[in-house]
Curated annotation (Swiss-Prot):
Source taxon at top rank: Eukaryota
Transit peptide keyword on record: yes
Localization, UniProt: Mitochondrion inner membrane
Function according to Swiss-Prot or TrEMBL: Component of the cytochrome c oxidase, the last enzyme in the mitochondrial electron transport chain which drives oxidative phosphorylation. The respiratory chain contains 3 multisubunit complexes succinate dehydrogenase (complex II, CII), ubiquinol-cytochrome c oxidoreductase (cytochrome b-c1 complex, complex III, CIII) and cytochrome c oxidase (complex IV, CIV), that cooperate to transfer electrons derived from NADH and succinate to molecular oxygen, creating an electrochemical gradient over the inner membrane that drives transmembrane transport and the ATP synthase.
Protein name: Cytochrome c oxidase polypeptide 5, mitochondrial
Ranges per topology, Mitochondrial matrix: 14-129
Length: 197
């Protein structure tokens, strides 16, 4: 039984390739002796197809006014036109028309999409909006401080001067601070005098 199945399998996969497979087999393969004929069919098809797609210039009406029409074109048409230009750019650039060169440059680097120029007056709108929000933030700040508790008693000039005297008596920071010889700084004083009530 095993012998019969092996002979059937061997008959189905014969060592001699069919004509359909022969054109795609390389000469350096294990069946090189059976594939001694040159493979002209395979090599002649691909260059003709790519040459045919890229040798014909794209029509001028298609490329005329592309700067004005590009944003309004559907994405499918944009993709098709770009693919045509991409295939066209694979040939020598001296064979491309001036319209094709301009269109390829504009589609690649033109002011559309994320590179579009901002509309007129946008900078002025941004300035006014920033100024408006800054004024609102100052207003919120002063409203919060209006309803805040009064400053603590330690935030008066008199209290801070008394803190300076205490620091000198206790010789706090005698090297660089208020107790050092020749010290000329303000010490702890940082607030205005207390308001008289």
């Amino acid at each position: 039984m095993f012998l019969r199945s092996v002979t059937r399998a061997a008959a189905r996969s014969s060592a001699v390739p069919t004509t359909g497979l022969r054109s795609y087999r390389t000469v350096s393969g294990p069946m090189a002796c059976l594939n001694a004929r040159p493979q002209t069919e395979k090599k002649s098809i691909a260059p003709q197809q790519t040459r045919a797609a890229s040798e014909h210039a794209i029509s001028n009406p298609t490329l005329a006014g592309i700067e004005k029409r590009w944003e309004a074109m559907p994405p499918q048409e944009q993709a098709e036109l770009w693919m045509q230009l991409r295939d066209r750019m694979k040939v020598d650039w001296h064979q491309m028309t001036l319209q094709e060169k301009k269109a390829a440059y504009w589609i690649s680097f033109g002011p559309h999409g994320p590179r579009s120029v901002p509309p007129k007056g946008e900078n002025l709108k941004i300035f006014f909006k920033v100024a408006q929000l800054t004024l609102v933030s100052f207003g919120i700040f002063y409203v919060i401080h209006l309803f805040a508790k009064p400053q603590p008693k330690t935030m008066t000039k008199e209290w801070q001067e008394a803190s300076n005297e205490y620091a000198k008596q206790e010789k706090i920071n005698p090297i660089y601070g208020i107790s050092a010889e020749g010290y000329e700084g303000k010490g702890f004083v940082q607030s205005p005098p207390a308001e008289k009530q």
